[in-house]
């Protein structure tokens, strides 16, 4: 069991690890061709969803002090709208970056202190009941990851793939 320095982050740790598993499972078997398909020109494609998921990991890492930058930040930062004129990375490229940044962010989650998590991190939401702290940002990142995995799961079914499996690879420690 991973023991974080912060009691406040204890809820985030298992969710983060499960999201790692879910992300890999929901993308399992999706072809590169299908990953770029949109439904009636109305949906984002799976590559965009996966890229935005990955961008959340980079953003969380940045908030926790990592210097790593998302090589595709220009395509995905803050849920930037899909633009079919852009050349998006392949799922393989995104997965490689996912395996690079995710363990680093996980380590930062284990090391962060309560004091650091209480620091203000303004993102300009302007929602009166949300205190913009690093802890709340971490929670919102996980919420976004949930949402994106659900969207990819729905796209799997629409594109005639089987539903996502909930297998766990115990060798992945992040």
Where in the sequence are the language-model features?
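An acidic intrinsically disordered interaction segment
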Residues: 14-21, 111-116
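Short, contiguous alpha-helical
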Residues: 13-17, 24, 34-80, 123-174
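Surface-exposed helix-capping loop/turn segments at secondary-structure junctions
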Residues: 29-36, 108-120, 157-162
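Extreme N-terminal tail/first-helix region
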Residues: 1-17
